[in-house]
């Protein structure tokens, strides 16, 4: 009997996914090569990536809505850096709701001014901050939608006129959700999608 894993990760995969992957590792689509033997620049691998990106957008309800999905290395923690590196020109706002948002704030400060608009640190992150002002001149607002360590989750997403960015590593694909509220979001694969080592990034 297959074990269940109720921790934050790694994700338990459906049997049909394991079976399809094991077949592809032996030989991919009758091409005479294993999935792990083909070039990452080959047409076969390009097709795999394009299908994965397209299916991700479809599952997220973002197909045909002006979003692009990409898979990157480095885990979600790398996105703490890359988000600020690419988007932070003047100043950004962050909501501090736990361990991962604390780390995101620390990394973003390497690239510019970071405003911690609200925090639940005063009560050991046991609630999601509410009732804060969001300046209109921010480059973006960053939130972490779910906090596995402290057991808190956004039930409503902040309404804002500035671009909204989210770390959704631990609750992406977990519930019906209007992902179009976000201008960019990212998630490490190992919690809800598959093996560790890759991050899904979706950007408008």
Whereabouts are the PLM-identified features?
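Active-site PLP attachment segment
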Residues: 181-204
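Conserved N-terminal alpha-helix of the aminotransferase class I/II PLP-enzyme fold
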Residues: 31-82, 99, 107
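Gly/Ser/Thr-rich loops at beta-strand to alpha-helix junctions
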Residues: 11-13, 74-78, 98-101, 148, ...
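PLP-dependent aminotransferase-like
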Residues: 76-141
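General beta-strand structural signal in soluble alpha/beta enzymes
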Residues: 5-7, 69-73, 94, 116-118, ...
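Active-site phosphate-binding strand-loop segment of PLP-dependent enzymes
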Residues: 9, 108, 120-172, 184
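N-terminal "arm"/small-domain region of PLP-dependent enzymes with the aminotransferase-like
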Residues: 1-39
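Solvent-exposed alpha-helices and their adjacent loops that cap or buttress functional pockets
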Residues: 61-65, 87, 132-136, 156-159, ...
């Amino acid at each position: 009997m297959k074990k269940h894993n109720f921790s934050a990760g790694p994700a338990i995969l459906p049997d049909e996914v394991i079976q399809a992957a094991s077949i592809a590792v032996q030989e991919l689509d009758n091409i005479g090569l294993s999935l792990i033997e083909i070039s990452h620049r080959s047409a076969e691998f390009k097709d795999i990536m394009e299908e994965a990106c397209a299916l991700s957008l479809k599952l997220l309800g973002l197909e045909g809505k002006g979003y692009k999905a990409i898979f990157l290395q480095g885990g979600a923690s790398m996105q703490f850096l890359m988000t600020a590196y690419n988007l932070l020109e003047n100043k950004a706002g962050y909501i501090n709701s736990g361990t991962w948002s604390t780390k995101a704030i620390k990394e973003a400060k390497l690239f510019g001014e970071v405003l911690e608009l609200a925090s639940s640190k005063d009560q050991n992150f046991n609630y999601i901050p509410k009732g804060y002002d969001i300046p209109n001149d921010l480059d973006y607002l960053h939130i972490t939608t779910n906090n596995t360590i402290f057991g808190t989750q956004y039930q409503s997403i902040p309404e804002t006129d500035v671009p909204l960015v989210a770390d959704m590593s631990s609750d992406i694909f977990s519930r019906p959700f209007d992902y179009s509220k976000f201008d960019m979001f990212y998630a490490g694969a190992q919690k809800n999608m598959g093996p560790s080592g890759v991050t899904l990034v979706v950007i408008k």
